[in-house]
Amino acid sequence: MIRPLFATALAALVLVPLCARAEDEPPVPATITFVVSSGFWEELPDAEDDAEEATAPQAARRGYYKLVAERQPDGTALVHLQQIEATPDGPKIASSTVLEEFSALKPYVTDIRPENSAGITIQPGLFATVYLKTDPAVAEPESWTVLIDDLGDIKVERATN
């Protein structure tokens, strides 16, 4: 009698944490349809800051860009641009913004692709193509480019092929 009761209690102790984990939020929300990490950015410390803190020189901040398409309840998407900083503790979001140029179109995003998939870029910045439809019934998507130059200026425009 005690042995089956003990086995049941032990099974409950093992299964309760598993059930709790199943109810936790997923690591990537279901509304995220596309994510592309590409390009890179770097911020050098200001010379004025170095003069004030001569005993502790600051390292340059570095990282990469991420474009994220997030599906909205009406089926259209928001396109987020994030700067991800590479830190000793791992990546962290340095900045995040919704690209209003896409929001104004109320797009149905069908794909996002980086300039190259090698993972290596020579110049700082980002070049990626967002494929979208403004009417879901249209067969072919439009191509839009997101360009960030070496100074950090962002340009979103329809691709010209």
Predicted regions: what they are:
Residues A7-P17:
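Bacterial N-terminal signal peptides
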